[in-house]
Amino acid sequence: MLLPALRAVQDACIPHAVFTHTFRGYINGLHRLGAGTVSRLYGYHVTTIWDSADLNIVATLPRLDPASRRPQPDNLRWVGPIIAAPARPQREDPPLVLVSMSTNGFRGQRRTVERTINALATLPLRAIVTTAGVLNPDDLPKALNVDVVGYVDHGELMPRCSLVVGHGGHSSSFRALAHDLPLLVIPASPLSDQRMIGASIAAARAGLSLRRSASTETIRRAITTLLTTPQYRSAATQIGAEVRASDATGQAARLITGLT
């Protein structure tokens, strides 16, 4: 957030831009009530500082961001998610499911991953679970059709996948959508942007969102529904086309150079 630096830049009347890496609806809502409350104790009002910048670049799709349906400051520009260009899809049969939860190790994350593995174990598919060092793969349940690993390049896996099960992080969720993949979102933290992202994806019919406490059977039913109902893939494909066409980095660069 660099609030002291932004305050100093504004006091010096130096042209500057701020970057919103997730939904504006979250930054101006729940985040303002969480981290924003702490910032106010030090005399920094996040919304005021953000809205006073010459430019606020929001790196997400406006139609999924709840804030796009409300009036916004004149400095705000949506450019789309900044995502590396996806490789050509090579879907596997039986379908391959990628499970990727947060790298922050939120409370209860192990139980969510365990229930997800148990849900996948009885389905006619293959799955790869990446733990990113947060959990030890050897400590998780074993299943013949599920590989549990530490680190794997998701950019290599996603073209082969038919579904992603994740925690609702903005980057990983939109990376999946850029590959035309529907999502099962199981938010790891009620204070993060994850619930809002999961709800928006579900509302767009590009996936489903469950509570962190969802049972193994509930997760199993959701995975089955997403793999067997074409409308979810269709909606994800439409969003994926929008992400790939957005030229987010180019738009952001042109906006920034326009400040000079």
Segments the model singles out, each with a brief description of its role:
Residues 12, 217-260:
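C-terminal amphipathic helix plus adjacent low-complexity
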Residues 54, 76, 145-147, 207:
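Short, conserved active-site loop motifs that form the nucleotide-linked donor/cofactor pocket
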Residues 20-21, 168, 185-189, 209-213:
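Short beta->alpha connector loops at strand-helix junctions that form conserved
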Residues 124, 134-152:
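Nucleotide-activated donor-binding/catalytic signature segment of Leloir-type glycosyltransferases, i.e.
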Residues 1-126, 140:
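Nucleotide-sugar-dependent glycosyltransferase catalytic domains
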Residues 151-198:
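A donor-sugar binding/catalytic signature common to diverse glycosyltransferases
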